[in-house]
Every structure is written in structure tokens, then in C-alpha cells.
Amino acid sequence: MPNIVTRFAPSPTGFLHIGGARTALFNWLYAKHHGGRFLLRIEDTDRKRSTQEAIDAIINGLKWLGVSYDGEIVYQSKRIERHIEVANLLVEKGKAYCCCCPEDKVAEKKAKAREERKIYKHKCTSVIPDAKPVVRFNVPDSQEIIVDDKIYGHIKVNSDQLDDMVILRSDNTPTYIFAVVVDDHDAGITDIIRGSDHLTNTFKQVLIYQALDFDIPRFAHVPLIHGRDGNKLSKRHGATSVCDYEKMGILPKAMRNYLLRLGWSHGNDEIISNEQAVKWFNLESIGRSPARLNFKKLEHLNNHYINNMSNEDILTLMLGESTLTNKKKNYLLQGLTELKKRANYLTELLDLAQFYIKDPPFDLSEEAEQVVKSNLDIIKLLASFLSNIGDKNWNKGFLSSQVKEFSKLHSAKISDIYHSLRAPITGVMDAPGIIDIMIILGKDECIRRLQAV
């Protein structure tokens, strides 16, 4: 399928929603699968609600996700002259007309029609001097509008169910329904992949394409993402924006893999690399039912990708711009191998690794504090006992044998000795094996921590 061109066209009125992120991913994968191009257009004609902060969040969110666009970003607000030109062309062709009817009166009539379960067909005939008219599209009567959707199949609606929609407001700014058609045509968009909530818009836009003698692109309307309860996704279901997941410590690869599997499948494959996704992606494998968020699956994927990343890469992501001594970085590089098995999020991993970063004396967990209070004498004896071990013998085998020897010497349970080491050295009671930690920290640091309590 040659010359495929897809696009992602968000409105910058908020952060990048995961539904939008999935739409962008699907468009990107479809274009890459066919060797085509993927474009980014910012639909910012609503100047009151569009913000630079939201634009930056969209661009940064796509970059974080690894979804790269081709060419320059197109800003819809910079194309208004083109939209006006095409609207005037439709008026000249008799496909659109100027309407001076007050908007509140039109809204009132629409509401009344809805109450009577009728379709309000607005046809303006009034001319008001000095009024600033809107431009309405002249919807033809009794015309069958057909959409061969790549997901939902053959869908049709009668034009009598549609009203004459506004395509140009009284301030000469275009409406979404109209600007999208002009922009997609001028950009050479061949395939439009978007949420199923746009399906009603598609019937209206097909009429505009036909009125302008534009080639109609192929459409694929993707079912929306729902919460676990089956209701439309909202903030009450948890994180809904890409930046929320980034802050939680989700890896881009995990998020991309998770979004890919929300409504699309390739047999029983769960872990899908970027290369496999590009190779396998097709529209036929997108289901018609809404996908449901499942945070457990996302956690599972994130844990998988955390454990398949090198400790060096994980450390870079964890620390960001923060500075640590080389000694502490070395602690982390060695300790992450065990710690990352326990973490589903980078933030969780950073919390688990705090005992490698902090200097004694540091805060103890409630349980660790109780162990220290109950075993102060033993801890002091351990510090003295360990100081007699030579640096060359500071290895797992020798340390383990010495702990057993100490246990016998003081008639104490070996588990109590391990607890008496773990509590002051790590400050927590659920860290990995204490002997492994002691090997990483080294003799001097372990004794320093034992003495600090």
C-alpha cells in the first residue's frame, strides 16, 4: 500500500491523554508498517482554551513515548486564511451559505426538536444589515452517506439526520468539523485513524469532502478506552495522562507495549518489541469493543522492562540530574540487580534503593527501629566482631560462616543475628539478602552503620 500518510491532530487544551497517546501510536505504527509518513498537527483554533503548556506536554509526551513525527509540526491557527478561502469557495458553489440567525435562537430550536425527538433542519433565509454571519454547510436532502470503516465495516446514515453545521464562525475562525477536512486534504492524509467518538463527525466530513471534490481518505475508528468498571475513562479511574505515568515511574517501552495491546492483539503475544509492533501492526486486528484499563498488566509489563534494562540505563533514568558520589553510584549499580526484581515502578525502585544512597545515621522503619532498640548490645558486639575480619576475607562465603560462628558464640538464633545486621545497615526489614548488601557496601561502611545506632 504505497504513499500512506497518517496524522495525529490533538487539541492543546490539556495534557496528552492515554487515549490520544494510543491514537498517535496506532497512526505511527500504521505509517511505519507501510513505509509511509506520520504527521503531527496541533489543532489550536480554540484560542481561549489552547495553551502553550498543553502544546509542550503533547510534544514531550510523544517524544517520551518514542512516537516521532515526520516534517514540521502544523499549527491549525496559522492556516485560518486557507480555511476562509475554502469556505468562500463552498458559498460560491452553493454548497454553503451565510446565516445571520442569533445562535441562542438556533440553540433553542435545536433543544425543542430534541425534546420532540426530531432532527432540527436549520435553513436560514434572513438577512440582517451589519450582522456578522456564520457560514453553514448546506447539507443535501435525503442523501445516503456511506463510510467503509476499517474497523466497524460498512456504515451508512441518511443526510436528513444531519443539520446544516457551522463551518465558519462569525469571527471567521473555522470549526473543527470543517478545518480538519481542509487540513487533511492539503497534507495529503490518506488514512485517518481516530477514536470512535468521531464517527458522527465523519459522516458530516464526508459530505464536505464530496462538496469540494476532494479525495476521501480511508477511515478507521478505534473503540474508546474504558476503566475497569466498563465506564468511560475518567480521573476517578486513576492516572489518565501520559505525564502521570511518566511521573509514576513507568518506562516508555512498557507504556508503548501496554497501549499497543489496548484493543489490538497479535495472537497470544504480550511482550512486543518496537520492531515487532511495526512489522505486525494492522487495522484488522483491532477489536470493536472498548478496551479496559488493567493496571496489573501495566505493572507486569513495567517490571519486565525494568528487569531487562541494564543497571546503567536504569540508574540514569532513576537519578535524572541529581548528583551522587561515585561510591554511591557503584553501590546502586551492584545492588540494582536484586532490587529491580521487587519493583514495578522506577519510583518504587528508587524508594527501595534509599539505603544505598543515605548516609548514617538515617531514619529507620518502625520495625527496624524496634529491632535496633531490642538488640543494641548485640549490634555493638557485631561491629567489633566484623572489624576483625580482614578485607580479603570480606566475601559471601566467609561472612556467612562468621555470622554462624557469632551466633554460636553468643547462643543466639541466627535469624536474630541477621535481623540485628539488617536493621542498622539498611534501616528496613524487607531488603534483599543482608550478606549480599554487606558485600556491596564493604567492610568500613557496614561497621560505620552499625556504630551509628
UniProtKB/Swiss-Prot annotation:
Motif ('KMSKS' region): 232-236
Catalytic activity reported: tRNA(Glu) + L-glutamate + ATP = L-glutamyl-tRNA(Glu) + AMP + diphosphate
Broad class of the protein's primary localization: cytoplasm
Keywords: Aminoacyl-tRNA synthetase, ATP-binding, Cytoplasm, Ligase, Nucleotide-binding, Protein biosynthesis
Top-level enzyme category: ligase
Intervals of motif 'HIGH' region: 10-20
One GO process term, biological-process aspect: glutamyl-tRNA aminoacylation
Pfam families given in the database record: Anticodon_2, tRNA-synt_1c
InterPro entries: aa-tRNA-synth_I_cd-bd, aa-tRNA-synth_I_codon-bd_sub2, aa-tRNA-synth_I_CS, aa_tRNA-synth_I_cd-bd_sf, Glu-tRNA-ligase_bac/mito, Glu/Gln-tRNA-synth, Glu/Gln-tRNA-synth_Ib_cat-dom, GluQ/Sye
Any one GO cellular component localisation term in the record: cytosol
Record: residues binding ATP: K235
Annotated localization: Cytoplasm
GO molecular function list: ATP binding; glutamate-tRNA ligase activity; tRNA binding; zinc ion binding
SUPFAM superfamilies: An anticodon-binding domain of class I aminoacyl-tRNA synthetases (SSF48163), Nucleotidylyl transferase (SSF52374)
Cited PROSITE patterns: AA_TRNA_LIGASE_I
Function: Catalyzes the attachment of glutamate to tRNA(Glu) in a two-step reaction: glutamate is first activated by ATP to form Glu-AMP and then transferred to the acceptor end of tRNA(Glu).
Entry similarity comment: Belongs to the class-I aminoacyl-tRNA synthetase family. Glutamate--tRNA ligase type 1 subfamily.
PANTHER family recorded: GLUTAMATE--TRNA LIGASE (PTHR43311), GLUTAMATE--TRNA LIGASE, MITOCHONDRIAL-RELATED (PTHR43311:SF2)
Subunit structure, interactors included: Monomer.
Name of the protein: Glutamate--tRNA ligase 2
Organism of origin: Wolbachia sp. subsp. Brugia malayi (strain TRS)
Upper lineage: Bacteria, Pseudomonadati, Pseudomonadota, Alphaproteobacteria, Rickettsiales
